[in-house]
Structures are given as C-alpha cells and as structure tokens.
Amino acid sequence: MSNYVIQADQQLLDALRAHYQDALSDRLPAGALFAVKRPDVVITAYRSGKVLFQGKAAEQEAGKWMVKRGADPGKRQERETASPPLEHRLEKLSAIGSDEVGTGDYFGPIVVAAAYVDRSHIAKIAALGVKDSKQLTDEAIHKIAPAIMETAPYAVTVLDNAEYNRWQRSGMPQTKMKALLHNRTLAKLVDAIAPIEPEAIIIDQFLERGSYFRCLADETRIVSDRVHCLPKAESVHVAVAAASIIARYVFLEEMERLSRTVGLLLPKGAGAIVDEAAARIIRERGAEALETCAKLHFANTKKALDIAKHR
C-alpha cells in the first residue's frame, strides 16, 4: 500500500476537510484532527499538520494538493504545498452562491436568495456591476437586480414577519432561522437547474460549517454536497454577490409593500427613526399591527411602546 505524507498549514487543512466532507470518518486515530475513508484512499490529518495518504489512490490524491519532489513514488514522500487558497480555487467554478438580507432590520422580512452562475457567465455577471449589495444604493439595486435575474437562475425564500415572530416565540434563534432558509433556498435552486450540478455551493458565512449543519438536523432534506461557508463570500465568487443583490431587491420590494399596507414609509435598520415609526403605527393601528410588519423581539418594540404611551 502506497503512503504519502504532506505538511499542511491551517488553511490547507480546512480546504482538505471541506473537499472530502462527504467521506469523513467518525473513527479517529490518536492525535488526528479528521480522517477520510474512501474505497481507494484513506487520509488522516494530524494536529501536527502532517497529512497521511494511504491506498491505491494515495499518490493521485496527494498530488492534487502538493508538488512532487521527485522522490521514488513507491516510498513515503514529503511534498511542498502548491495548492492555492480555497477562495482562489472557487472563484472560477460554476457555483451557487447564497446570502440573506433583513436580519438586522426591525421592519420587514428575512429574505434569502441563491443564484447560480456558470463559469461561462462569470464575466458577464461581473460586468453588470455586481458586488456586495451593502456597497450599492437602493437605486443601483433596482437597476442591477433585474438584469441578474434575467441572466442567472435564482431562487428566493421570504420569511414574513408573522412567521418570523412565531418561530422566534417558539425559541428558535435567528441563526437557525437563517440556516433553515438557506438550506431550503438552495434546495429549490438545485432542483431548478437539474440535471446541471454546481461545482461549488458557497454560503456567505453566518455560522461555522459544522454549526450550520447542526441547525439542519431535523430537516428532511439537507443540501450538503460541495457546500462551503465562507466569510465575505461575496468577494470569493460573483454568485454570492449576485444572490446578495437579488435578496436585497426582494427585501426592498417587500418593504414597499408593507409600507403601503400600514400607510407609512417604513425605515430600514433598527435606530431611533425606527422607534418613532413603530410608535406611530401603535398609536394609529394598535400594537398588534406590528405583528405582521416587525420583528417583535427587537428592543425597538419596547422603546416604541414607551414613546406611544407618553405622547
């Protein structure tokens, strides 16, 4: 049996774990961080940074991550890292990206969007001016989002305020809400583009990957193949930036709809102007009107009640 040993830094260890996630083993030898078991190769990563490849495909698998030093391929070998950072390997792939909007806004829903960008369309989508939606004005969002939606397959899930408040009262933290919404949105898009399979699925990170999947333990369907949870993912792949823009576009549309319903232009965010708007709704429509347009557990609710009471 062929054995190959490579030395890995933390970045490479993370990349290895993500790449072989579907074959991770629960049985770990002493000193191991993780182990991978496939029919043709067993890979063991140790706390020391050593990674051992064993089996018929050991040379092939190790070669994906390292540059040969010219040693006898039949012997245990050391290799130098040549693998670029994970982010650089992902940016040119055909990928699904997902992002959410509305989690920090008192008024309005949470919107999760996912977009699929084929590698042949990356330049075209980027040329539309796609970047993190937080860097774009509302006017720019209304201009760019429809162009993205005409070009890239996408899926959207909206958690309205009434449902959000029910979930929150049941004890569900917002991080789990987001995990459920991302998973369901990804499932819709994966189905929509089938039989095409994305080479990667990139979630703008709000939880570490393990914590994200623990939130999905009770789901009947979990999208897990090739899923990466990465910070600032909108700068990793244009698909995430596209999803961010679509999510914000839908959020803005929902905010306009809610504003018409309550007869008041609802402000974004959770600052003092939001307290005043909520207090006005309470005075004009009653506190119960907030149930369908606001996230009631935010501190803004108490502040608005105090304002409405003393005016």
From Swiss-Prot:
Q: Which GO terms describe its biological process?
A: DNA replication, removal of RNA primer; mismatch repair
| Binding of a divalent metal cation, residues | D99, E100, D204
Which purpose does this protein serve, as stated in its record? Answer: Endonuclease that specifically degrades the RNA of RNA-DNA hybrids.
Family the entry assigns:
Belongs to the RNase HII family. RnhC subfamily.
EC code: 3.1.26.4
Q: What is the lineage of its organism?
A: Bacteria, Bacillati, Bacillota, Bacilli, Bacillales
* Keyword Lipid metabolism included in the entry's annotation: no
Return the InterPro entries for the record: RNase_HII/HIII (IPR001352), RNase_HII/HIII_dom (IPR024567), RNase_HIII (IPR004641), RNase_HIII_N (IPR024568), RNaseH-like_sf (IPR012337), RNaseH_sf (IPR036397), TBP_dom_sf (IPR012295)
- Return the cofactor note field: Manganese or magnesium. Binds 1 divalent metal ion per monomer in the absence of substrate. May bind a second metal ion after substrate binding.
Task: Output this protein's name.
Answer: Ribonuclease HIII
